[in-house]
């Protein structure tokens, strides 16, 4: 798992989009990019699959957990899943989404998919369950 973090407005979304576009060049599997807005969808290069959680009425932690499990289950060729704003998507504080990170860690281990996420906050603000993934 890879985490892009920093306070709001510090370029996390641009960094994760750039990373997704760079991963496309070497990825052997499919790439999925998930967020809750259409704002940056056109900045992703094809064939990266762009998913807006608002289109699927995902508004809670449990719904998002099911959403990411479904993405992994529906396509065994998914290599990367990029998530921009995991806490925002779940309508939770960052400190409250530990079970989502547990789910992603389990999916990485069991299915070999790589999760790349953005988290808003300084390094000091990040909960321990996220800090262990920070470079």
Pin down the residues of each PLM region:
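Conserved P-loop
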Residues: 1-70, 126-128
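Flexible phosphate-sensing "switch/lid" loops adjacent to ATP/NTP-binding sites
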Residues: 70, 77, 87-90
């Amino acid at each position: 798992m890879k985490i892009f973090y920093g306070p709001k407005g510090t370029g996390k979304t641009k960094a994760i989009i750039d990373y997704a576009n760079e991963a496309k060049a070497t990825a052997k599997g499919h790439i999925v990019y998930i967020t809750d807005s259409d704002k940056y969808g056109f900045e992703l290069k094809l064939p990266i699959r762009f998913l807006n959680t608002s289109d699927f009425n995902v508004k809670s932690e449990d719904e998002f957990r099911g959403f990411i499990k479904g993405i992994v289950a529906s396509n065994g060729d998914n290599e990367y899943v990029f998530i921009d704003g995991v806490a925002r998507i779940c309508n939770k504080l960052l400190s409250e989404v530990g079970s989502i990170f547990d789910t992603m860690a389990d999916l990485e281990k069991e299915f070999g998919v790589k999760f790349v996420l953005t988290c808003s906050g300084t390094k000091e603000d990040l909960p321990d369950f996220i800090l262990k993934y920070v470079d």
